[in-house]
Amino acid sequence: MNPDNEDSIHDFLQSQITDTPLSLNNELSNRGVKFNHRDDFEEIRTFIDEFIDGNNVNRYIVLPGLRGVGKTTILFQVYDYLLNQKNIRHEQILYFSCEELNKIEDCDIYDTIKYYLKTFHNSSLQTLDEKLFLLIDESHFDKDWSLSGKIITDKSKNIFAIITGSSAINLEYNAEAARRMIRYPITPLNYSQHLKLKYNYHTDISNDLIDLLFNG
């Protein structure tokens, strides 16, 4: 990290720590109606619960997917779950978008997290003694995202990281990092999933069609 940028990265991180909890309602609802969870969220929540319970194996989750399929919403739902259901302090959860981080010259994911630990937790990757959750959006703006994620989660067993990015990140990850990460592609909703999310209507379309074809 360029030392001249420390004030900028400090202000950026302080804003993320302070403002993200206040933005949850706007990010997770429309006209007062809270968004339902995708099935993908339920899978990710399992890894989170295991980590909180002391299992530190599956801590590096990567969510590739097309723009607009709901990756950012999942990250905010994870934040909300940690804060309001698991009683994790907001100081232990960091959300940021690499698209915004990219506006700070010579600043990447790895340097940002090192600065975050040093400045806001008086710690380092090697000495961190509390559980932290990193929710990193739009990782494709950092060409070294996969290696950074690997190093961060390798050096600290107390960090749980979820990283999202465009579908292209499927082709960009470091070979060594690929052995450590869990890739969970976020795909466009099918019709059943759309009904569940938008109208809270649960149905198995395939079974309904079979029943209609054979039973009229």
Regions found by a protein language model. Give the residues of each.
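Interdomain motor-coupling "hinge/lid" segment immediately C-terminal to the ATP-binding subdomain
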Residues: 166, 171-216
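Conserved catalytic/switch belt of AAA+ P-loop NTPases
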Residues: 146-162
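P-loop NTPase Walker A phosphate-binding motif
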Residues: 72-90
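Short glycine-rich substrate-engagement loop in P-loop NTPases that contacts/grips substrate
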Residues: 94-129
